[in-house]
């Protein structure tokens, strides 16, 4: 039996923390589908197509990783892709309560959907897309927090 998992997120932009979790999930599971979410309540810096392309550009070395944009309920996306496991990252205890609520709601909506939590490598535990964008907006160097092509895309988007 092959295990298809979904690692969902906005990825605006994808960071070293995200990439760390994707690489680790790819080592544990047969197929990892990175679900790049369109959420109408969020105002991302990069549009959905840009976020998908950026995620693809930094995961090319992982043959069992697919990048797919989606909107709507995550459980419907999981069903469409025959996935029965969600991978979520927990940076700190403060993430746990919200993630626990989401996991229980997803389980209620799709009982066969399991959620697996991964903690980031210590050097990535404080990185968030929001903080990276804030640093980049103020012309700070984000190269230690995101892959090179993401740093370039941020600079182009913010200052071109």
Swiss-Prot record:
It catalyses: (R)-4'-phosphopantetheine + ATP + H(+) = 3'-dephospho-CoA + diphosphate. GO terms for molecular function: ATP binding; pantetheine-phosphate adenylyltransferase activity. One of its GO terms (cellular component) is cytoplasm. Keywords: ATP-binding, Coenzyme A biosynthesis, Cytoplasm, Magnesium, Nucleotide-binding, Nucleotidyltransferase, Transferase. It is an enzyme of class 2 (transferase). GO terms for biological process: coenzyme A biosynthetic process. It is found in: Cytoplasm. The keyword Transferase applies. It comes from the Bacteria. Pathway: Cofactor biosynthesis; coenzyme A biosynthesis; CoA from (R)-pantothenate: step 4/5. Pfam families: CTP_transf_like (PF01467). InterPro entries: Cyt_trans-like, PPAT, Rossmann-like_a/b/a_fold. Substrate binds at residues 10, 42, 74, 88. ATP binds at residues 10-11, 18, 89-91, 99, 124-130. Disulfide bonds: none annotated. The record marks 18 as: Transition state stabilizer. PANTHER family: PHOSPHOPANTETHEINE ADENYLYLTRANSFERASE (PTHR21342:SF1). Belongs to the bacterial CoaD family. This is Phosphopantetheine adenylyltransferase.
